[in-house]
Curated annotation (Swiss-Prot):
NCBIfam families to which the protein is assigned, alphabetical: gcp_kae1, T6A_TsaD_YgjD
The protein's name: tRNA N6-adenosine threonylcarbamoyltransferase
GO molecular function: iron ion binding; N(6)-L-threonylcarbamoyladenine synthase activity
Binding site for Fe cation: H111, H115, D298
PROSITE patterns with a match to the protein in the record: GLYCOPROTEASE (PS01016)
Iron as UniProt keyword: yes
Cofactor-binding details, from the entry: Binds 1 Fe(2+) ion per subunit.
A Pfam match: TsaD
Function description: Required for the formation of a threonylcarbamoyl group on adenosine at position 37 (t(6)A37) in tRNAs that read codons beginning with adenine. Is involved in the transfer of the threonylcarbamoyl moiety of threonylcarbamoyl-AMP (TC-AMP) to the N6 group of A37, together with TsaE and TsaB. TsaD likely plays a direct catalytic role in this reaction.
Swiss-Prot/TrEMBL keywords: Acyltransferase, Cytoplasm, Iron, Metal-binding, Transferase, tRNA processing
Record organism: Thiobacillus denitrificans (strain ATCC 25259 / T1)
EC number of this enzyme: 2.3.1.234
Location of the protein in the cell: Cytoplasm
Length: 341
């Protein structure tokens, strides 16, 4: 089955074609980073308008690059949530309308399920079950994944997400948007041992996270030291955040008796996190899997893939063929999803 995937939950417009028999056929992405940079963060109304401008040209692009035809589509998948309501509606409206016109089923995909399954797009996907670290600007969760749609929440952030902490710390250090990558580049030139920062909840005995205290500690440090030691502060923050993510993730693997760990989401592109998890995972007998760097951030490929897995169910396809509802879910718990029948 050839599935078109549409991602428009925040500040990236992504479109992709996934063939159940051939794999990923084509994908295209437009990032709004340059547009939002002047505002220091995502402006929802601007994001929605830009999705409207980009979504059709990107759709044409993936069909032209792949040589596939609209008539070959077996289904359409779009991000239904969580995310910005207006941005989500752009992709949902496009997906439902196209599916209705072609008389094929459409399915709303959970954004985090797309991230969680993105490493499975590779040539060497992890086998089930595995523990997944979902780590992005809006979410930080540890999940036990038994199969597609069978997710057990092990722990999550109690306040700020890891990616949010990276971005806010970057703002404190006078860096641009998006802050996470800029902070990591600055940290590479710093001394992580220069300043001692807390590792919140590292030894709490559970799998929950908290990054607000770490962010506050950085604020206190910046007020005391100024920005003359910005590289060292960035390095100390990154080391502290990575320590917590690595420690909690491997503890969750031990708890679940899982020897496979999947890392997904934008923070999964962080080089220090990848280096530490791979090294310490290896010592613990845990194989660590990552999506390719281009699929760490939001993209249409992960939505097309996740949609294809769910549309593989004949019953699901029949049920969705006449479904015209394109309501979105700005808030949507991943653990509430049902399994693929």
């Amino acid at each position: 089955m050839l599935v078109l995937g549409i991602e428009s939950s925040c500040d990236e417009t992504g479109v992709a074609l996934y063939d159940s028999a051939e794999g990923l056929v084509a994908h295209a992405l437009h990032s709004q980073i340059a547009m939002h940079n002047a505002y220091g963060g995502v402006v929802p109304e601007l994001a929605s308008r830009d999705h409207i401008r980009r979504i059709l040209p990107l759709t044409r692009q993936v069909f032209e690059e792949s040589g596939r035809l609209l008539s070959e589509l077996g289904g359409v998948a779009f991000t239904q949530g969580p995310g910005l309501a207006g941005a989500l509606l752009v992709g949902a409206g496009m997906g439902r309308a196209l599916a209705f016109a072609l008389r094929v089923p459409a399915i709303g995909v959970h954004h985090l399920e797309g991230h969680l399954l993105s490493p499975l797009i590779s040539d060497t996907p992890p086998a089930f079950p595995f523990v997944a670290l979902l780590v992005s600007g809006g979410h930080t969760q540890l999940m036990l994944v038994s199969a597609v749609g069978q997710y057990t929440l092990l722990g999550e952030t109690l306040d700020d997400a890891a990616g949010e902490a990276f971005d806010k710390t970057a703002q404190l250090l006078g860096l641009g948007y998006p802050g996470g990558p800029a902070l990591s580049r600055l940290a590479a030139a710093g001394d992580a041992t220069r300043f001692a920062l807390p590792r919140p909840m590292l030894n709490s005995g559970d799998f929950d996270f908290s990054f607000s205290g770490l962010k506050t500690a950085v604020l206190t440090l910046v007020r005391k030291q100024g920005l003359g030691q910005a590289a060292d502060i960035a390095a100390a923050f990154e080391a502290a955040a990575v320590d917590v993510l690595v420690g909690k993730s491997l503890a969750a693997c031990r708890h679940a008796a899982a020897n496979r760990l999947v890392v997904a989401g934008g923070v999964g592109a962080n080089a220090r996190l990848r280096e530490r998890l791979t090294a310490e995972g290896g010592r613990a007998g845990v194989s660590v899997f990552y999506p390719s760097l281009e699929f760490c951030t939001d993209n249409g490929a992960m939505i097309a893939f996740a949609g294809a897995q769910r549309l593989a169910s004949v019953a699901d396809r029949v049920a969705r063929a006449s479904d015209l509802d394109f309501a979105v879910k700005p808030r949507w718990a991943l653990a509430s999803l049902g399994p693929v029948e």
